[in-house]
């Protein structure tokens, strides 16, 4: 059905992603590839160089932790693990989803979303931000 599917996930909220997994698998059918994407917040440019090494070490730790959790998430899928790719990036979810979509010439984004609340309506959420700025179809799973 779809060849290249991007699935933004929060590795620290597995239950939210679990809801979207079955939908992504269905869309992938027999030969589609699912690209799991976890986005870590980018650090602001630091003018205090003495802290830069500490920030880099912390970012490396976060990236390693995210990669391990993504690997664990692969076991939640029923499709062949070779059809699931993992990406960890720094930045905003919206921008990184769009960048990866462009790099991969992706067909669709599948993203889990919480049930709406007053805070997500007022402040926005990753899912709503991705929807507003994506240049490809987005399936939101609740």
UniProtKB/Swiss-Prot annotation:
UniProt similarity note? Belongs to the universal stress protein A family.
Name the InterPro entries for this protein.
Rossmann-like_a/b/a_fold, Universal_stress_UspA, UspA
Q: Which residues form the signal peptide?
A: none
Per the UniProt entry, what species is this protein from, by scientific name?
Escherichia coli O6:H1 (strain CFT073 / ATCC 700928 / UPEC)
Q: Name it.
A: Universal stress protein G
Q: Which domain of life is it from?
A: Bacteria
- UniProt lists the gene as uspG
């Amino acid at each position: 059905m779809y060849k290249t599917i991007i699935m933004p996930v929060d590795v620290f909220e597995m239950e939210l992603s679990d809801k979207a997994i079955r939908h992504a698998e269905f869309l992938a059918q027999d030969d589609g590839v699912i690209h799991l994407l976890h986005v870590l917040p980018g650090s602001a440019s630091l003018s205090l160089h003495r802290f830069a090494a500490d920030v880099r070490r912390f970012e490396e730790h976060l990236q390693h932790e995210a990669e391990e959790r993504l690997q664990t998430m692969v076991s939640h899928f029923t499709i062949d693990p070779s059809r699931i790719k993992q990406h960890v990036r720094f930045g905003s979810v919206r921008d990184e989803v769009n960048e990866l979509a462009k790099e991969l010439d992706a067909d669709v984004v599948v993203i889990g979303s919480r049930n709406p609340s007053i805070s997500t309506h007022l402040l926005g959420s990753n899912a709503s931000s991705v929807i507003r700025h994506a240049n490809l179809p987005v399936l939101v799973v609740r």
